[in-house]
Structure formats: structure tokens, C-alpha cells
Curated annotation (Swiss-Prot):
This is KAT8 regulatory NSL complex subunit 3. The gene is KANSL3. GO terms for biological process: chromatin organization; positive regulation of DNA-templated transcription; positive regulation of transcription by RNA polymerase II; regulation of mitochondrial transcription. Component of the NSL complex at least composed of KAT8/MOF, KANSL1, KANSL2, KANSL3, MCRS1, PHF20, OGT1/OGT, WDR5 and HCFC1. Residues 476-511 have a biased composition (Basic and acidic residues). The lineage of its organism: Eukaryota, Metazoa, Chordata, Craniata, Vertebrata. Residues 476-563, 608-678, 697-719, 762-782, 869-904 are annotated as: Disordered. One of its GO terms (cellular component) is histone acetyltransferase complex. Its main location: nucleus.
Length: 904
């Protein structure tokens, strides 16, 4: 008795461990076998030299074998005092009993005459068999015998702790016997309709409930034959009774319906696409079974499920087995290639049953997939077991999970272990105790373990989730990021980053087929158009350079502002008030220095942020990058220079035109025949990204004063004579600090606008695409200047210098009135470095890029100040911009530019 009690306790604990995932328990609880409880010198699972890629076998509901004790005790103690606790069922007992008695509660719906008294208990003696044929008598006796066995099982299991499971097993057994009896008469329509009418009229209520349970089970398996059987009774009971009976027989009940409906499988990371390979040619005559539909609905919780059906011409007439197999493999392979073309960065998981598992393995050898799940893998073939030297499956590089039954005829667990040792790919094995080739457990196993087939299927699905979660997490770890949703990630992060990272994942796997993400060309414009991502089956994604219209740009602006909220910034950035406070202090010091300047000083001072020479490491980086003829793919987090540069452009607009015209780079037409006065400082290194922010003064009223960064780097053309610079600078500043003239913008508002734009640039750089240009980048930005202004080219700085434009209040008389005197004043203005120390008080603005996001520090920032005659000048957005034109004669920008969305 003690041995039997210990065996029962062990089975109870094993059953709880086997279904621990139904209670959301730890996975490691299931791995408590004797090896973990043995001595410390027990060999681990990876001690075998050939088992480096084979993970330990997971056992589901496998009862350990224990040898019976040979010694017979004379005195066996019997414990009559200890109360054994009732084992907790693995389902909601109350809900299971409710669905279990559903047919008994609604048995009246099946009777043709509801008002007639129910048949007595001895109904068999009252059955009139006069005129029955031999076939009718034999069929009736077979059905009656099956129903009597079910009735006895119900009475025997009544009141048991796991009565719903035992009832389910008995109903399935009765349904199988009824189906065999009906098949013995070849489902003769007249005979089965006569049988159904006779049983409904003569059976007692308990026996009729058992008969309805059997019909309910068969309706889910063979709905067409059952509908043909119920035609005669539906005409007698009427429309209401027929509808009630149809609803009752709609689906078979399951004790675990509550557990399975409330505990859905969790979604896999990366939003994978799950392809189900068919086990044979599909046919409309044989619809998918209820169990396969349950599997497909459960797998749809993990990701997008795409069944791959194989259709043969002329119903497969004249098609051999080898041709059919080649057709099946070709269908799955073409579907994989189609998905790769439409969704190149989506993980693909192949799942197959039996022969479909073999098809999935063969496709994984030829095409790139993330993982393969083989359910009921057939190891034995016509030519013998698999695993020979010439077996193509030994070349698999894709992680694979094998799920087999303990009692499988086509795959023995020990032979499967030998086969796993020969595979170089990462593989795992799950053995389902008491299951056959289709992973269906026997009735004895269901009774002993208190399980149903749906519970076993759910536990297998949990094992699949554990395996795929680990594979997908490691696959995304190779791409240099934590698990995340690829659907949202394709909007936040440019695909070229994943394209680069997949490149060093593929060589790591040897001969594994390369991911299609590594085959896509780089974007020629340095920024990827999200409109090129197409999910349509008729179009393939491709990178392209387009001229963005105003409506398209507004939609991109909205999406960029929305995505900005989801980007986590790990580095501290300047807030709005901090930037205002720093610029207020900067302005105050600027005013003190401005009062001490001589009257003839120009109204703009170019202040270098750092005047020290660049470090040796930066010079070496610059020399190496300038030697490259094409930009390489930098690793995330690397940077070419520690400090960005600012390019300053002074543009004035007047009514007079002279000199060569600068073609407009904005989408809105500007004044034709303009000539900007532009100065560029520093060099643009090859492969580096250029971050360009433009502060423009456009036509608006004095009440607007909007400040933003232009979405595209462009230089607006302007018609100038050299004398227009004085007009511009006289409008930009006030005559005295205390007075404010109408139409004049003070230095405070200009600096405040600069703070807004720089803060916006700092907060948005983490969401910008970083794609180097495939062509060679210019080593220096070339600028065309008018002849009187050639002296501006004398001012050059290193790559680590930031130059800012600071307006200083002055009068018109201090600038000189003649065009010939202006170059001298500007020369004095640019060569003056008196405010170099003053600008060093702004350390927070030197680093305006979020380096934690993986983007490089911007190398250049362009500040453009444009004045318009007879207009009130304010800081406002430039308007709708277009893609930068590379044939501009006024300013040549590097092609690897980054577009900035405007400030909200």
C-alpha cells in the first residue's frame, strides 16, 4: 500500500509538472529529473562531443518507469487515518461540469413530439421490431450496444474528481463505435435516416442524451454525413426544433474550454510570419479537421499564420509521388521567396505535420528561414531510417524543434536522439508521453493523467513558444538590439541598420542561405522613403529618390512628430527653459561686450565655440576617411568627429539684380536672378552624415515669429547687390538695446529662436535615418562667391569648430555707405575672435546629437539668415521644401544629408 501510495503521489506531481504552463508556472519546473538530483559529477547534456547543438530532451507527460520491488513484506501497514487530499484538476471544474451536462439539459429538443410522455426505463421491451430487415436489426443492435456501454461508464464515473475528463473519454469511445456501425452499412441514406428517427422516438432520456453526445462529437468530424442523417427528423420537428438541435450539435464540449480561452498563447517577439506546410495535396472534398483548425487558431496568437496549400491539376491524375513531393516543396519555397520580397525583415517560421515537416526541413536548406517546427517528424522512410551520409537534412543550419510521440511508429525517441547528434543546426526535442505519430494520446493516458487532447495540444504549443522565443530573441540579438516589434520598428529605425547587422549574422552560420535583407541596395539619397515599403503582393519594395510634395511632407512631418514620443533618450538633452536661460545669460554677456566695441565694427560676429586645435585622434580619423573612395557602413555608436560644425549663410534680398543667378532649391519659387552671399567653414568627411538646420527670415507679420528647422537642407536664392548687406543687418538689429523699432528683430528673439531650433534638432536626431550615400562624398563644400567677397574665403576652421552668428546692435553709419567698403568691414568682422571665450560658456550646445541612439555626431550645421526689403522680418519656417538639387551652383551639399522635421 505504501508503494502504491508513493506511485500515485509521484504521478500527481508529474502531472502537475507536465501541465505547469497552463498555470503560467516556471518552465524549469518541468526539468526536475534524476540528473539534477544526482551527484555533482553527473555529466551535463553537452558532454557528448557530437551533442554540442542538441538541446536536452523535454518530456511531456512521460511517466518514469519504476521497477517493482521483489521483496514481499509479510506485514503491510495500512494507513486508515491520513486523509489524502483531492488532486486539483487542471481545468475549471464548475464550468466543465456545466458543458458536460449540456446535452442532458436540452435533450427535449431532439424529440419529435415534445408533448408525448417520455419512454419508460424498460423501453427496449416496448420497441416493436416487426417488419425490420436483417440490416436494420444488426445496425440497431450495434448502436444500442455502444450506447449501453456509454451509459455504464457514466454511472461508474459519477462523482469522481475528474469526472469531466472521464466523461469526455467515454463519449469519444461511444462516438467511434457509432461511426463504425454506420460505416458498416456504407452510410446508406435511407437506413441511417430510419435509424435516427427510431432512436429519437424510442430511447429513454438518459440514453438519448448519450446518443446526442455521440452525434455532437461526430458532427465536428464528419459534418456532411451527420447533416444527411438528420434531414428526416428536421422535417418532423419543425424549424424551431431543427435550429435548436443544430445549435446543440454545433461543437463538441471540452472540459478545458475555460482554461484554453482565458490563457491564450503570448505573441512572439518580432511579429514573425508562420508558414504551415501541407502534408499532401489539398482537396475540397476533405476539409481540415477540427483539431487542425484549433491548432491554426492557437498559432495565430503567436503571429501571422499563412497556410501553404498544394493544388494538383486534374485532381492529381497522372502525377507520381516524386512529382507531387517536388510540387509541394516548390510551393512552400515560392511562398518563402514571395514573403522575402514583400517583407524582407520579417522572421519566417516553417511548421509542418508529418510529411509537411520533411517539406519544411528541405525548404530551410534551400532558403533562409528563422526556425522550423516539425510535428510528428517521420524518421523512418521507405529506404530505411534517416541520418545517412547523403541525407540532405544533415546540412541544416536553421534551428529546428522536433515534437514526436512516445509511441510513434515512424520515429522512435532513441533513434531520434542519434539523428539529432548528426545535425549541426541547433535543435530541440519534445517527447509527448503516450502519443502516436499525430501526437494523439491514448484513452488510457487520458484517464491516468486526467487530460484531454486539447490540453496536450496546448502544452505542445507552449513548448513551441518557448523554443521560438529563444530563437527569435537570439536572432534579434545578432542584429544588435533587444526584442521588439518589427512592425513599429520599421518606422522608427531605417532598415539599412538591420541590413548591415544581418551581414555579420549570415557568415556566422556558414552555408545557411543568406537573409534577403542583406541583398537590398543601399538608399542612394541617404534617407529611406517609407512609401517604398509595400505590402501589396503585386509590388516589391525598392528604395527610390523622390521629390516630396507639400502634402507628402506634411504627412511625414506628422509621423515623425508622433514617433518622437516613442524614442527613449538615454542622454540628457537641453529642455526648453534651460536653453532659454543659457541664451539669456549669453545675450547679457554679449551686450556687455557690445558696448565696448568701436563704432565701425560690423553687426555680425562669427564666434568659434572651441579655438583649440583638433586632437590627434580626430586628425587621424579625418585622414583615414578622406582616403576612402566610398563610404563604409559605420558601426552604431561610432563617430567621425567629436564636434559638429556650423555653416553660416548670409543672404540678402534686394530689388537690384547683378551677377550670376543661384538656382532655387526650395519647392516654392523664389525671386529669380538672386545671388547669395554664402560662406562655408570646415570640411565634409566621406561617409559622414550632415545635419543641417536652417533659420530663415521669410515674409510674415511681426506677430507670428515662428521658429523651426527646415525639413530639407536648401539655400534659398536671392537677388542681391553687394550693398544689400547693410540693409539686411540694419533690419536684423535695433539701434539701441532699449528701443524697438517696428519691423526690427532684436538679438534676443534671434538667439531665442536659435535655442529652439537647436533643442529641436537635439531631440529629433535619434529618430532620423542614418544611411550613408553609396557614391563618393565631396571632401570639402565648395562655395561660389562674388568677386568683391573673395576675402571671405580666408576664414577656415578645423573639423572640430562650431561657428555661430551673433547679431550686435549698431547703427547704419557704422557699416559704411559704399559697396567698396563692405568687404573691409566684413573682413574685420570675421577675423575678430574676441568672443571665443564667451561662447565656451555654452557646453551643452556643443553636443546636439543623441549619441546613445546609434547615430553619428553631425558634422555640419547651416544657419541661414535671409532679409527681405520693405518687409517686417521675423523668424519663420521656410515653407515646403523639396529634395536638395545636386546641380546647384551656389552651394554643393554632401549627398548623405539628413532631413529634419520642423519643430512642433
Amino acid at each position: 500500500m505504501a508503494h502504491r501510495g508513493g506511485e500515485r503521489d509521484f504521478q500527481t506531481s508529474a502531472r502537475r509538472m507536465g501541465t505547469s504552463l497552463l498555470f503560467q508556472l516556471s518552465v524549469h519546473e518541468r526539468e526536475l529529473d534524476l540528473v539534477f538530483l544526482d551527484h555533482s559529477y553527473a555529466k551535463p547534456w553537452s558532454a557528448h562531443p557530437d551533442a554540442s547543438s542538441a538541446r536536452p530532451t523535454r518530456m511531456l507527460f512521460v511517466t518514469p518507469r519504476r521497477q517493482h520491488e521483489s521483496t514481499i513484506e509479510s506485514d503491510v501497514p495500512i494507513d486508515v487515518e491520513t486523509v489524502t487530499s483531492t488532486p486539483m484538476p487542471l481545468y475549471d471544474n464548475q464550468k466543465a461540469r456545466s458543458v458536460m451536462n449540456e446535452c442532458e439539459r436540452h435533450v427535449i429538443f431532439a424529440r419529435t413530439d415534445a408533448d408525448a410522455p417520455p419512454p419508460p426505463e424498460d423501453w427496449e421491451e416496448h420497441v416493436n421490431r416487426t417488419g425490420w430487415t436483417m440490416a436494420q436489426n444488426k445496425l440497431f443492435n450495434k448502436i444500442l450496444k455502444a450506447l449501453q456501454s456509454d451509459r455504464l461508464a457514466r454511472l461508474a464515473n459519477e462523482g469522481a474528481c475528474n469526472e469531466p475528463v472521464l466523461r469526455r473519454v467515454a463519449v469519444d469511445k461511444c462516438a467511434r463505435r457509432v461511426r463504425q456501425a454506420l460505416a458498416s452499412v456504407s452510410w446508406d441514406t435511407k437506413l441511417i435516416q430510419w435509424l435516427h428517427t427510431t432512436l429519437v422516438e424510442t430511447l429513454s432520456l438518459p440514453m438519448l442524451a448519450a446518443y446526442l453526445d455521440a452525434l455532437q462529437t461526430l458532427k465536428g468530424k464528419i459534418p456532411t454525413l451527420i447533416d444527411r442523417m438528420l434531414v428526416s427528423s428536421n422535417t418532423k420537428t419543425g424549424a424551431a426544433g431543427a435550429e435548436a438541435l443544430s445549435l446543440l450539435l454545433k461543437r463538441p464540449w471540452d472540459p478545458a474550454v475555460g482554461v484554453l480561452s482565458h490563457n491564450k498563447p503570448s505573441k512572439l517577439p518580432g511579429s514573425p510570419l508562420i508558414l504551415i506546410a501541407s502534408s499532401g495535396p489539398s482537396s475540397s472534398v476533405f476539409p481540415t479537421s477540427r483539431r487542425h483548425r484549433f491548432w491554426q487558431s492557437q498559432l495565430s496568437c503567436l503571429g501571422k499564420v499563412i497556410p501553404v496549400a498544394t493544388h494538383l491539376l486534374n485532381n492529381g491524375s497522372g502525377v507520381g509521388v516524386l512529382q507531387c513531393l517536388e510540387h509541394m516543396i516548390g510551393a512552400v519555397r515560392s511562398k518563402v521567396l514571395e514573403i522575402h520580397s514583400h517583407f524582407p525583415h520579417k522572421p519566417i517560421i516553417l511548421i509542418g505535420w508529418n510529411t509537411g515537416a520533411l517539406v519544411a526541413c528541405h525548404v530551410s536548406v534551400m532558403e533562409y528561414v528563422t526556425a522550423v517546427v516539425c510535428l510528428g517528424f517521420p524518421l523512418l522512410t521507405v529506404d530505411g531510417p534517416r541520418g545517412d551520409v547523403d541525407d540532405p537534412l544533415l546540412d541544416m543550419k536553421t534551428p529546428v524543434l522536433f515534437v514526436i510521440g512516445q509511441n510513434s511508429l515512424q520515429c522512435h525517441p532513441e533513434a531520434m536522439e542519434d539523428f539529432r547528434e548528426k545535425i549541426r543546426a541547433e535543435n530541440s526535442l519534445v517527447v509527448v508521453g503516450g502519443a502516436d505519430d499525430n501526437l494523439r494520446i491514448s484513452k488510457a493516458k487520458k484517464k491516468s493523467e486526467g487530460l484531454t487532447q486539447s490540453m496536450v495540444d496546448r502544452c505542445i504549443q507552449d513548448e513551441i513558444v518557448d523554443f521560438l522565443t529563444g530563437v527569435l530573441t537570439r536572432a534579434e540579438g545578432h542584429m544588435g538590439s533587444e526584442p521588439r516589434d518589427q512592425d513599429a520598428e520599421k518606422k522608427k529605425k531605417p532598415r539599412d541598420v538591420a541590413r548591415r547587422d544581418l551581414a555579420f549574422e549570415v557568415p556566422e552560420r556558414g552555408s545557411r542561405p543568406a537573409s534577403p535583407a542583406a541583398k537590398l541596395p543601399a538608399s542612394p539619397s541617404g534617407s529611406e522613403d517609407l512609401s517604398s515599403v509595400s505590402s501589396s503582393p503585386t509590388s516589391s519594395p525598392k528604395t527610390k529618390v523622390t521629390t516630396v510634395t507639400s502634402a507628402q511632407k506634411s504627412s511625414q512631418i506628422g509621423s515623425s512628430q508622433l514617433l518622437k514620443r516613442h524614442v527613449q533618450r538615454t542622454e540628457a538633452v537641453l529642455t526648453h527653459k534651460q536653453a532659454q536661460a543659457q541664451f539669456a545669460a549669453f545675450l547679457k554677456q554679449n551686450m556687455l561686450v557690445r558696448k565696448a566695441l568701436p563704432p565701425g565694427t560690423s553687426s555680425c560676429l562669427f564666434v568659434p565655440i572651441s579655438s583649440e586645435p583638433p586632437e590627434e585622434g580626430e586628425k587621424e580619423d579625418l585622414r583615414v576617411q578622406l582616403k576612402r573612395h566610398h563610404p563604409s557602413s559605420p558601426l552604431p555608436g561610432s563617430k567621425t568627429s567629436k564636434r559638429p560644425k556650423i555653416k553660416v549663410s548670409l543672404i540678402s534680398q534686394g530689388d537690384t539684380a547683378g551677377g550670376p543667378c543661384a538656382p532655387s532649391q526650395g519647392s516654392a519659387p523664389e525671386a529669380a536672378g538672386g545671388k547669395p552671399i554664402t560662406m562655408t567653414l570646415g570640411q565634409a568627411s566621406a561617409g559622414a552624415k550632415e545635419l543641417t538646420g536652417l533659420l530663415t527670415t521669410a515674409k510674415s507679420s511681426s506677430s507670428e515669429g515662428g521658429v523651426s528647422a527646415s525639413p530639407v537642407p536648401s539655400v534659398v536664392s536671392s537677388s542681391t547687390a553687394p550693398s544689400a548687406l547693410h540693409t539686411l543687418q540694419s533690419r536684423l538689429v535695433a539701434t539701441s538695446p532699449g528701443s524697438s523699432l517696428p519691423g526690427a528683430t532684436s538679438a534676443s528673439s534671434l538667439l531665442q529662436g536659435l535655442s529652439f531650433s537647436l533643442q529641436d534638432i537635439s531631440s529629433k536626431t535619434s529618430g532620423l535615418p542614418a544611411n550613408p550615400s553609396p557614391g563618393p562624398a565631396p571632401q570639402a563644400t565648395s562655395v561660389k562667391l562674388p568677386t568683391p567677397m573673395q576675402s571671405l574665403g580666408a576664414i577656415t576652421t578645423g573639423t572640430s569648430t562650431i561657428v555661430r552668428t551673433i547679431p550686435v546692435a549698431t547703427t547704419l553709419s557704422s557699416l559704411g555707405a559704399t559697396p567698396g567698403g563692405k568687404p573691409t568691414a566684413i573682413h574685420q568682422l570675421l577675423t575678430n575672435g574676441g568672443l571665443a571665450k564667451l561662447a565656451s560658456s555654452l557646453p551643452g550646445l556643443a553636443q546636439i546629437s543623441n549619441q546613445a541612439s546609434g547615430l553619428k555626431v553631425p558634422t555640419t550645421i547651416t544657419l541661414t539668415l535671409r532679409g527681405q526689403p520693405s518687409r517686417i522680418t521675423t523668424l519663420s519656417p521656410m515653407g515646403s521644401g523639396a529634395a536638395p538639387s545636386e546641380e546647384s551652383s551656389s552651394q554643393v551639399l554632401p549627398s548623405s544629408s539628413q532631413r529634419l522635421p520642423p519643430a512642433p
